[in-house]
Amino acid sequence: MRHTIRTTLAAGALAALTALATLAIPSRGEAADGVDAIKQRGTLIVGVKADYKPFGFRDPSGTIIGLEPDLAADLAKRLGVKLELVPVVSANRIEFLQQGKVDLLIATLSDKPERRRVVQAIDPQYYSDFVNVLLPKTSGITDWAQLKGKPLCATSGAWYNKDVARTYGAEIIAFDGSEKPLFALKQGNCLGYVYDQSMLQGKLLDDDWKAGYALPLKGILDAPWMMAVAQGNATLQAMVENATKDWMKTGFIVDEEKKWGIEPTAYSKAMHEKYKNATN
């Protein structure tokens, strides 16, 4: 009887320990808290854009590719784990990070104080971009002041929508993602599409757009882009910050811009100059 009780208790204790160990290892598709947990799981989960060529978009097979997925792949390689990319849009990317659906955001996230209050920003910022408007070549628009009272398609959640409306008097018509406002622009539902300049430059690499559209205005509202992890995830923060400095030291991001047909930005070149001779 005593032997049976001891055996039962031992089996119960083993089962409990096994359950605890299982709970301690994040499952695939569930964000991990810290570098060690990511290594245990064997996968780094990164939120990226899938409709933002050339920073994150789908190839003909449906695979997400682009400059930011390349950065994510480099981080996964440094960690020695596999990479899982989760598509996000401007309106849900921070929510996905807060809900633990992703470990890290590399998703054209402009650096704003209100965002730093709810996520852990990665410093230094990895990129910087202007705001611009994709317009038909026949629009006759040559100055931002001419946009007063004009309808502009926009992406929901973009921080500059209110600034453009308030400063220049444009009427903002917001859509989810970037494909819907681009479609609306082609349908004539708005005069132009206000968005990140680099993405609009990417669209003009496509024959479908460069024939009839252009960026006649000077870019405004220059804003750095930041990567982000969940608040309190200090080990992943440190790892990504060290990698970012290494990218700047080696010129990796400048090379990525060239790879994806982007004219290297003044920011990328300046950060490479700043870090290329750094010793740590």
Predicted regions and their residues:
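Ligand-binding clefts/hinges and TM-proximal coupling segments of bilobed small-molecule sensing domains
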Residues: 33, 160-175, 211-216, 244-280
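Alpha-to-beta junction loops
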Residues: 44-45, 80-82, 99-107, 150-151, ...
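Acidic, polar ligand-binding/catalytic clefts
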Residues: 73, 77, 82-146, 211-213, ...
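Short helix-initiation/N-cap motifs at beta->coil->alpha
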Residues: 69, 84-95, 157-159, 173-187, ...
